[in-house]
Curated annotation (Swiss-Prot):
InterPro entries, per the entry: DUF247_pln
Keyword terms of this UniProt record: Glycoprotein, Membrane, Transmembrane, Transmembrane helix
GO CC terms of this entry: membrane
Family the UniProt entry places it in: Belongs to the UPF0481 family.
Pfam families: DUF247
Subcellular locations according to the entry: Membrane
Carbohydrate-modified residues: N365, N403
Disulphide connectivity of cysteines: none
Membrane topology label: Single-pass membrane protein
Name this polypeptide is given: Putative UPF0481 protein At3g02645
Keyword Acyltransferase: no
Top-level taxonomic group: Eukaryota
Length: 529
């Protein structure tokens, strides 16, 4: 038996979608919103940039629960939809006067604002969207009640708790904060009580999930910031990222270039001498002078091993140079998006050997990242790592990339930490000095997590962070241990041809002296005999 044909053809379905789109546009244009409501409407819930989604899709795709319209129709999340409806029935039974139809009617005046918060077009009709908001906001509030500082009963158990936590912190899995406030206000019948409870659960959630240890000091300032937040992920972002304006760094760059030019004159002078030596040794007369005695010596008994070692040293540098050129070409061929700019900053281990000491700051804000050049102390906010941290970090970076037009402060901070953490030894040192608190299985897992964050939507510079990086580099390169090590690396290990030539000349002189002594002693014995 042939399957039944669909009621609407593809053309009719396409025409139906267009009709619904026109209706939504007319409804949006005809809606009467007050002036302050229009100012508050901002796009704040975005799709993850493809560059980031391709690098680690598991961190951006919900696995257990959908919040909002973007992922609610996915079959793998339907099981949790039934659970959300069960929680909704319990909420209805708990509050005698609570009816979801009344909540949907309360949210109806906010439909235009709700749609305006989403960057992607929402294909649901108004009633469907409002019911999604009512059910999801009620579930989310019940789930977050366990983080309240007050003793509030919750209807949700902790089964799959961490999975749900990761899902509700994803950028595509957000609902506007004003919807949560309206739902709580409807339940508690008090705007002030709703704000107090919502602020309480959000601060508790941020303390548990934040990658930086946050301390909330002033309640009044916190309430003022809370009023301006767009959703849960935005609230966490505002708590750990300072608000700064885009700075003009041209003058600072010129000063830094002047300082670098003055400080590197001696090194450039030595490089020029080395370059001239290479030009002399690369000439044909010098090549003949060098190779002729070397061929004689290499054919003597016992010198074959020395010849093989020298040939290896000569050819290895050429092979490394060829490999470096090939790698540079391959890097240029990498397609967009760009890799995160590798910071020119030593690792924690190298800095520790050079005398740098890492100190945790009292507040978890990124603005506390500083370096004291006099004492060699590197101040960093305390980093909190657990099984949820990677997802939170990646979604904060994605949210900043889509929502911020100025400097990407949090992205630059993650690049800084990625630059100083290269191995498990770096993680161990940070942990022992109180800068990092890890609940992962091992230090190696923590290092791999940071090093895995290698994609960025766009490169950026942040004034106070870049100044800190420059101060650290200046302090590190100014240490005598580092200077001597670099000189040995550049002018000893990097000059095998010159060293091999000097060794060959010295060996030739010793062999000649030995032959002369042998011939002269034989001549004396001959005359004496």
């Amino acid at each position: 038996m042939l399957p039944k044909k669909p009621i609407f053809s593809s053309t009719e379905q396409h025409r139906f979608d267009e009709t619904r789109w026109v209706i939504n546009v007319q409804k949006s244009l005809d809606a009467e919103l007050e002036e302050h409501d229009l100012e508050e409407v901002t796009v704040s819930i975005f799709n993850v940039p493809k560059a980031l989604m391709c690098s680690h899709p598991d961190s951006y795709t919900p696995h257990r629960v959908s919040i909002g319209p973007y992922h609610c129709l996915k079959p793998e999340l339907h099981e949790m939809e039934r659970y959300k409806l069960m929680i909704a029935r319990k909420i209805r039974n708990q509050y005698n006067s609570f009816r979801f139809h009344d909540l949907v009617e309360k949210l109806q005046s906010m439909e235009i604002k709700i749609r305006a918060c989403y960057h992607k077009y929402i294909g649901f009709n108004g009633e469907t969207l409002l019911w999604i908001m009512a059910v999801d906001s009620s579930f989310l509030i019940e789930f977050l009640k366990i983080y309240s500082f007050r003793k509030v009963e919750t209807l949700i158990n902790r089964v799959g708790h961490n999975e749900i936590l990761r899902d509700i912190m994803m950028i595509e899995n957000q609902i506007p904060l004003f919807v949560l406030r309206k739902t709580l206000e409807f339940q508690l019948e008090s705007t002030e009580s709703a704000d107090d409870l919502l602020l309480s659960v959000l601060t508790g959630l941020c303390k548990d999930l934040s990658p930086l240890v946050i301390k909330f000091d002033d309640d009044q300032i916190l309430k003022a910031q809370f009023q301006e937040c767009n959703h849960i992920l935005d609230f966490l972002y505002q708590m750990i990222v300072p608000r700064i304006e885009e700075e003009e760094l041209e003058e600072d760059d010129e000063e830094n270039r002047a300082d670098e030019n003055g400080g590197n004159r001696a090194i450039r002078f030595m490089d020029e001498i080395k370059h001239q030596f290479k030009r002399v040794f690369a000439s044909r007369p010098a090549d003949l002078i060098l190779r002729f005695p070397w061929r004689i010596i290499s054919n003597l008994p016992g010198f074959m091993a020395l010849k093989l070692s020298a040939d290896y040293l000569f050819t290895r540098q050429e092979n490394e140079a060829t490999t470096t050129r090939q790698e540079s070409v391959s890097i240029l061929d990498i397609e967009k998006p760009p890799l995160v700019e590798e910071l020119t900053i030593p690792s924690v281990s190298d800095l520790h050997k050079a005398g740098v000491r890492f100190k945790p700051t009292a507040h978890g804000n990124i603005s506390t990242v500083t370096f004291d050049s006099n004492s060699g102390q590197f101040y960093l906010p305390v980093i909190n790592l657990d099984i949820n941290t990677e997802t939170v970090l990646r979604n904060l970076v994605a949210y900043e990339a889509t929502n911020t037009s100025g400097p990407l402060v949090f992205t630059r901070y993650t690049e800084l930490i990625n630059g100083i953490i290269d191995s498990e030894e770096d993680v161990r040192l940070l942990r022992e000095q109180g800068v990092l608190v890890s609940r992962l299985k091992s230090d190696q897992e923590a290092a791999e997590m940071w090093n895995g964050m290698s994609k960025s939507v766009r490169l950026t510079k942040v004034g106070f962070l870049d100044k800190t990086i420059e101060d650290v580099n200046r302090y590190y390169t100014g240490r005598w241990k580092v200077k001597i090590g670099r000189l040995v690396e550049v002018y000893v290990y990097g000059s095998w041809q010159i060293l091999a030539f000097l060794a060959a000349v010295l060996l030739l002189m010793l062999v000649s002296l030995q032959l002369f002594s042998l011939v002269f002693s034989s001549f004396l014995r001959f005359r004496a005999g």
